[in-house]
Amino acid sequence: MKTRTDRRWWILAVLCLSVLLVVVDNTIVNVALPTISKDLHASTEALQWIVDGYTLTFAGLLLVGGNLGDRLGRRRVLQLGLALFGLTSVGAALAHTSAELIAARAAMGVAAALIYPATLALLNNVFTVPRERATAIGIWSAVSGLAVAIGPVSGGALLQHFSWSSVFYVNVPLVVVALVAGRLLLPESRDPRAGRFDPLGALLSVAGITLLTWSIIEAPRHGWGSAATVGGIGGALFILAVFGWWQTRRPDPMLDVRLFRNPRFSAASGAIALAFFGLFGFIFMITQYFQVVRGYDPLGAGLATLPFAVVTAAFSPAAIAVMKRVGTKVVVAFGLALMSSGFVVAASTAAGSPYWGKVVIAMSLMAAGLAFTTGPATEAIMGALPRDKAGAGSAVNDTTREVGGTLGVAIIGSVLNSGYGSHVVTALTGLGAPTAVAHEAGQSVVAGVITAAHFPAALQPAAADAVRQAFMTGIHQGSLVAAGVTAVATIAALAFLPARARASQLPATAAAPVPVAVERLSRMGSRAQRR
């Protein structure tokens, strides 16, 4: 009987490996950005799209991916996504231009959108006892948080010995392991009442999210008040509003918008979105800060983010344990407040601040905050749904993470770019650089470093310092934006997130079908525990 019980945790291990692959690729590329910028002559805008090309398609297609899993079978869709992820990783590694790399990253995002919601949906169907499910979700969330920090470390280690393409090639053997183990261990499950696929809803959701993020990323180039930016954002919001209206008209919607009437579901989704907004924006900045401002090599930059992984791992189990005692509201609000305070510390960090001072303190506060936010909030989302709708619930949870993260990189990256660009142009012009040269330096911090190296020898130290200080100005401004967003999220969690699910909000699990294999597994596991 024990082996049957243990099998569920082996299933969880396979699901966590799949999650690790998907989430690591959100951040592993960040540490390679300076190298990619040099090799592919990529601007800051192109670097943002190398990051956002993945998260944009990932976020835009998550609802479709979750919906397909509910209809076709979650294990089948997960396996398809893993195979596609391996193939597109090879495509990214073979890219010769920034445009090719952006296209490959976008294709990887499509694969990730099939993988991510299936993992949480399968978990929800395997762990049917609420307390065990909360623990499993806590582990799943911890792996997601760890993967964010592991990405720069593993990327730095690879770049120490190989080219930037290695950060994509490394996915292939892990995909093979996940495919084989998944085939042997994972049970199949689906929603027997899924209904017909909604192609118009899929098109509207993808179009709305894509247009919104594109408009924000391009805002610094066009201007925040330009017709392109205002029209793009307005058009995106209109498309998303039409999507919401269309879903209310469908008998079998991709996303049942009535779920958002449940404050436990909607407030938890918002908390995750805003937490990842700040987190991904900061990771985008900090990996470049370690290499450009502090002069670390890629491995050193990756290792410098290691405290984030350690703190996340340390606090994730505690977050679930505390949530079981005091409820979701206090834990999630506390986590968001910790994140906000971490961003405030980051905003006061100077170029020469000791690493073991404000830098580590800022990262540790953010990591602890992430642990206290994501696990409990994810459990609140999944606990509000019947198991046959686990794919839809997982897709909402994953979409909020990816949309929040995508917009975080877009908005905070735009603030960073604007702050750095305006200050470096003024500073380098003051040192005698021609206006055209100064504006070229303002395109990216790597371009600024190269420009400073071409100044006369006597002025090179001053020019290099001007580039570093301008970049720090952008980091300060971006960190303050993240601090403000997570502070607002803290207040919203306290105001709207219930401490525990009320009876009227509990899912109708009795009516939810459970796969036969999972039902037997759960019964045998319960008997083994009683023994």
Model-flagged regions — what are they?
Residues 1-184, 317-319, 326, 344-347, ...:
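Transmembrane-helix bundle of Major Facilitator Superfamily
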Residues 1-19, 242-245, 264, 368-370, ...:
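Transmembrane-helix exit segments and adjacent C-terminal regions of multi-pass membrane proteins
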Residues 2-4, 177-206, 248-263, 324-325, ...:
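Flexible interhelical linker loops that connect adjacent transmembrane helices
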Residues 9-58, 163, 200, 225-388, ...:
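Transmembrane core module of solute transporters
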Residues 36-37, 68-69, 157-162, 216, ...:
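Interfacial helix-cap and linker-helix signal at transmembrane-aqueous boundaries
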Residues 73-82, 95-99, 115-119, 126-138, ...:
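C-terminal module of multi-pass small-molecule transporters
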Residues 160-172, 218-228, 297, 418-483:
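A membrane-interface helix-boundary motif in multi-pass transporters
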Residues 172-190, 208-217, 236-250, 492-497:
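C-terminal membrane-cytosol helix-exit motif in multi-pass small-molecule transporters
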